[in-house]
Amino acid sequence: SEQAGFRILVGNDMMAAAGKTFEATHPNAKFLLGEIQKFDAKDFLEAAGLKPGELHCLIGGPPCQGFSVYNHNRGLDDDRSQLFHEYMRIVEGIKPAWVVLENVTGILSAGGGAAADAIVESFENLGYRVEKKILKAEEFGVPQERRRVIFMGNRVGAPIVWPDPTHGPAGGRLPPFVTIKDAIGDLPLLENGEDLGAQPYKTPPLSEFQLRMRGNAQYVTNHAAPRLGAINVERLAHIPPGGSWRDI
């Protein structure tokens, strides 16, 4: 978000580990640790030093188990989907100019489309005009295939403009998709269960992505291979190049 020009003010999560990561990457922001049900909009406003209506954008991603394509009893009445209503409670109290909500693609078919319609209606009831769209992470330089539904809207009458893809298939007009090799091809090979600790990079960056991810770092850290049992090692040996567990 900061790379896109935003100044991050406050974050929230119920997991302390997530809070430590947030504080490390956003040292000038405040973090509220705990379940969202324990907080009111005024808690976030006080932490941000703002009044209702002054925040430019509120971003949320309520846990999406209730909307999963694997959940056959899904909809906004699912207990795990109630966190969406908590998110809307905070939106109502903070009154941000813009709102962004992220969820799995299964939300579009949950309840025959009723869940997605209910989300849009909930925003509209608070004065927001909202649109939804599936965005593909690989089209924006992320080295993995990931689809997410983004609900984006505002209450200030501004046009809703979706970003154009920055990456595409090789040979097209856009830079090619970032591959796994582009992302981690400079990391040393490890044996099963091996952890070499911190060590200097053995090669210069081999791709633009690696150059950007390294920054000023001179050492490889947190690079370890989990120890797998013999049966899992055997399974991995039978996955062909470019394949997955489905090919075993």
Q: Which sequence ranges carry the predicted segments?
A:
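Conserved radical SAM core fold
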Residues: P63-F67
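S-adenosyl-L-methionine
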Residues: K20-L50
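Class I S-adenosyl-L-methionine
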Residues: D43-E54, V69-I248
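Short beta-strand element of Class I
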Residues: I8-L9
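Redox-cofactor binding/interface segments in oxidoreductases and associated redox assembly factors
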Residues: G34, G60, L101
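Conserved SAM/SAH-binding beta-strand->alpha-helix loop
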Residues: M15-A16
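Conserved SAM-binding loop of SAM-dependent methyltransferases across substrates and taxa
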Residues: S1-A4
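Short SAM/SAH-binding signature in class I
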Residues: G53-G61
